[in-house]
Amino acid sequence: MMDTFSCNSYEQNHPHDDDIDIDAHDHDSHGGDHQEESGWTTYLDDFSNQYRTTHHEENDHQDKSSYSLLATSTSLVSDAATHAFSGKSFPVNFPAKLKFGRGRTKKICEDDSLEDTASSPVNSPKVSHFEHIQTPPRKIEDYVSSSFVMGNIRGMGDHQIQIQEGGEQKVTLMRNLIDGNNNNNNNNMDLRSRGLCVVPISMLANFNGRC
């Protein structure tokens, strides 16, 4: 009886001890989950923050580089525009291989001996000197020999033509003489047939002198 009363009195005095223990256990379990969750979240937050900062720095660097390139290009364009507007021309320096020999042409044009080459190029000593240099000696000898041979052939041809012409003249002369003699003989024969004799006047003169 005494024990029953003591248990009841203890329960009356401590009616919520079990609830307190359960709540404490639940609180402990929830606290551990919260601690675990907070650890993962901090790790993820750190990773995301690091990625964001890195990506932001790269974007800033790209923006700065693009801005610097843009500023440089605009400055170059503005400089070119100012030089073009001011009328300044940039000298173009060609290499020596691309000058196309203009200096030599200028020297030739400034030569006094070539001033009258349009009207009389043969009289210019420069032109005659160039012709003498440009014609090799072998070609000159060939030209001289060929001209000599051609001249001889032409001379021989002219001589043969003259001989032929002379021969033809002689032949025609002989033919004319023969024809004349034949005509005279024919005339004499006609006179003789008529009873007349042809006597030269000199014979008559001599005959009269003798008489």
From Swiss-Prot:
It is found in: Cytoplasm; Nucleus. One of its GO terms (biological process) is xylem development. Disruption phenotype: Collapsed xylem vessels in the inflorescence stems. Expressed in vascular tissues of cotyledons, rosette leaves, sepals, petals, anther filaments. Expressed in roots, inflorescence stems and developing seeds. Its main location: cytoplasm. Residues 13-37 have a biased composition (Basic and acidic residues). Residues 1-12 have a biased composition (Polar residues). Signal peptide: none annotated. The keyword Iron-sulfur does not apply. InterPro entries: VUP (IPR039280). GO terms for cellular component: cytosol; nucleus. Keywords: Cytoplasm, Nucleus. The keyword Cytoplasm applies. Residues 1-40 are annotated as: Disordered. It comes from the Eukaryota. PANTHER family: VASCULAR-RELATED UNKNOWN PROTEIN 1 (PTHR33974:SF2), VASCULAR-RELATED UNKNOWN PROTEIN 1-RELATED (PTHR33974). Involved in the regulation of xylem development and growth. May regulate secondary wall formation during vascular development by modulation of brassinosteroid, gibberellin and auxin hormone signaling pathways. Plants overexpressing VUP1 exhibit severe dwarfism with extreme short and round shaped organs, and display extreme longevity before senescence. This is Vascular-related unknown protein 1.
